[in-house]
Amino acid sequence: MVLIVLGAVMVGLLAAAAPAAERFALPEFKSGYERPTTEVPEPRDYTLDWVDVTVLAVGLGVASYLALSARSRRWIWLVMFMAFIYFGLWRGGCICAIGSVQNVTLGLCDASYAVPLVVIGFFLLPLVATLLFGRTFCAAVCPLGAIQDLVAVRPVKVPRWLDHGLGLLAYLYVGAAVLFAATGAAFIICEYDPFVALFRLIPLGRHGSTMDAFPGSLTMVAVGVAVLALGIFVARPYCRWVCPYGAVLRVLSRFSWKHVTITPDECIQCRLCEDSCPFGAIQKPNADEPSPDRVIGRRRLAILLVLVPVLLAAGGVGGWALGPPMARMHYTVRQADRVRLEEVGRVEGTEDISDAFYDTQRPKEELYTEAEAIVGTFRTGGLLLGVWAGLVVGMKLIH
């Protein structure tokens, strides 16, 4: 039996290595034309992926030292610019820690998918660095933050209530990204990344890397340009209000071993930093503010605690109702919808998505059953996403 298997493998390898025979005779040209040889780019060396992980680890270490010990904004700018060149222009924004959330989620929910070790490294290294030294990944190593910092030439101060409210979007985004990744429907963080398409406009990548083609749509290029235009006046809008990985790091940073602080023995109490920080990261001390009325505070807290279950229930119902529309992001559901429309005669002709199903020669009922199961999964996932949204809104109101 072993010899049979080995023989089959050898035959397959020899067949793959042999030159393919032409199906039709080639024409004979009298003009001296020579048929070009078909060239296939070599796959990227896997060891280079570990070079990316090493660069990430070194960048996190250097950025942490510069932020906590050297306290040098100028050198942090240099690290940030190098990260922009390497992870942004050279690697085309892929692989990135932000999108790795989806790979890890899919790996946990789909036993047939194995998360590459490199992706796990990109996912874990910034998390560990945040628990130790704060959000140094966001400060200096993330290419998405770097490109926004490069255009923030005239930042204005965003009102705290608006900044606080828009911060909800990132938590809702990470919840939606987890749902779509867990169901195998889409990696929405990667599909709707506003900067990857811009990164890949400049082909600095190696031969045979992801930089050989421009995959970004014109729509995402326009979105990226719009975000950068906003970033001229609002520092890092994507990082502050949309980035899903940043939302995770924001929570973890509350438990960091060390934080960047204003050194008390060097501070002269000028309080200029409170208004000069373009990101609104410095919270003003409230020593000069009058003490709040405890009775009013308790009453407000009681009302909010009663409101939280209402928000959870409303979010759950809304998410459950949105399950079927969200399920259309899944290829199988879209395929089943198209085949059903063709079956009842509501559309004429076929499309590629339905032709792909017909080529499998599977029964239509099997496709419909599979699609209904996916819709049911999205209803459950939508309910959980809605509860998560209600919880986030409730916690924001209490905070």
Give each language-model segment a name:
Residues 16-268, 272-275, 280-399:
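Non-ligating segments of multi-cofactor redox enzymes
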Residues 4-13:
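Bacterial N-terminal signal peptides
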